[in-house]
Amino acid sequence: MSEYIDEIAIKVSSGNGGDGATSFRREKFVQYGGPDGGNGGNGGNVYFLGNNNLSSFKDISQKKYFKARKGGNGKGSKKNGKNGEDIIIAVPLGTEIINIETNKLICEVLKHNEKHLIAEGGKGGLGNAIFKSSKNQAPRKSTSGKDRVSFNLNLNLKSL
């Protein structure tokens, strides 16, 4: 007989944004190469997806922490970092998602393939090529990626 789980507590975290790069163009016979640092990639998001083939939280009960990937760092030659991979958590229809810290209902999953963004990934940092201007033609400034967002959640399955 299969196990039926209708309430579960989990932690979800989005991914950090990647850092922007500080880099300058260096080539043979190019004496003064300008700034060419790329931007960092965005961190991965965490989504909940309604699935009418599921009837309990048995599939996700073994894993208590879901973390999306970090965005890649920028590189020279204006190469932007790769965006972090998203995580999609399939839940049965009728799932209530409640933030444990605030005890507030975030959302309800009521339809098949209904997708809810729960934790948005951090924004990627800017490379020094972005900060180039007529007054500052060789900026040594780049920004770090934004931090991730984490939530402790309680998932309740209500009968439909």
Kindly label every feature range from the protein language model.
Residues 1-160:
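Conserved P-loop NTPase architecture
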